[in-house]
Amino acid sequence: MVDSYDDSLDGEKSKSQVKRELHALVDLGERLTTLKPDLLNKLPLTDALRRALADAPKHVAHIARKRHLQFIGKLMRDQDTDAILQLLDQLDASTRQYNERFHNLERWRDRLIGGGDDVLEKFVGEYPDADRQQLRSLIRQAQHELAHNKAPASSRKIFKYIRELDETQRGLR
């Protein structure tokens, strides 16, 4: 009779599991090397890891960069990776929200330029502080530029104006 014995029941991790976890730490360290210094300061990191992350851009040769990332991965073993991942997820979520809001404003700009008074009325309904006269003037200029293949200066002005309106309405200004 052959007994099958499962090592995972002992509570010890398999060699493969340990390797996967170490590779995940190296990947997290590589992700940290792409962050700006002011964002890194918000993370709970040791001084040695901060120095290693600051030195990362100096290593441009492939093997040197790989070796340095392995070193960062080694330093990551002493970190609270759950807290770091949680903060990185919050940063990603805020970036996603910002991009979503930005794309929404671009869609408004495009609809205003391509649409008529009904689109303008919908916009003013959503942004009551909007100056209709200024918007109409900018829309006419943008339509003229579009028809004559000129640079979209008025289109940029419309976007800037509706972005300022949005920020004011959200209390960011």
Curated annotation (Swiss-Prot):
It is found in: Cytoplasm. SUPFAM superfamilies: PSPTO4464-like. GO terms for molecular function: ribosome binding; rRNA binding. This is Dual-action ribosomal maturation protein DarP. Member of a network of 50S ribosomal subunit biogenesis factors which assembles along the 30S-50S interface, preventing incorrect 23S rRNA structures from forming. Promotes peptidyl transferase center (PTC) maturation. Belongs to the DarP family. The gene is darP. Keywords: Cytoplasm, Ribosome biogenesis, RNA-binding, rRNA-binding. One of its GO terms (biological process) is assembly of large subunit precursor of preribosome. InterPro entries: DarP, DarP_sf. It comes from the Bacteria.
